[in-house]
Amino acid sequence: MGAVLYHVSEFRGITAFEPRVPPSPDSGIAQPVVWAVDDQRLHNFLLPRDCPRVTFYPAQESTESDLRTLMGPSGCTVRAVVAIESAWFKRVRDARLFLYRMPPDQFEIADAAAGYWISPRSVSPLDVVEVNDCIASIVERQVELRLVPSLWPLRDAVVRSSLNFSCIRMRNARAREGTTP
């Protein structure tokens, strides 16, 4: 059986996804594609699209020190952490998302650690599930939702660590302390 893939949207009723150029050059992909995420990393996207977040989880080579420092005491009971800025809490709480299940045979893996899959052609979803409680959907996946005043200190620590991570929509995060917006 192949991977279970999703495209997450705040819009209902999408019948086909068209390839688009990725908004960030960090993806390393220059051509237009349709993006999907596998079920293992779906928690990274169970938030409003523009919500900045830092997500992280153990890698095979993660050190005990990094696990203890960044995953915290819950590290033994959660499989990942999704951190958002506390200013986004109400928007996350009130968000409604649509999980479009995608046909895996039309996608190829782009980044195994991040769970990213891409297709260079138009893709029609197999079905759709509505999510009315993003917080519960994240927590039910054994993922900690962490609220922080600013993502930057955590982002910097995670990037320097031995953990796997994704930093998503950071352009929407609060300005770093000591910088002008």
Question: What function would you assign to each model-found segment?
Answer:
Residues 1-31, 48-49:
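ADP-ribose/NAD+-binding catalytic cleft of ART/PARP-like enzymes
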Residues 10-12, 36, 104:
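Short, flexible loop/turn elements at secondary-structure junctions
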Residues 4, 34-35, 97-100:
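A broad, low-specificity signal marking well-ordered, structured residues that form hydrophobic/aromatic
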Residues 39:
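Long C-terminal interaction/binding lobes of large macromolecular proteins
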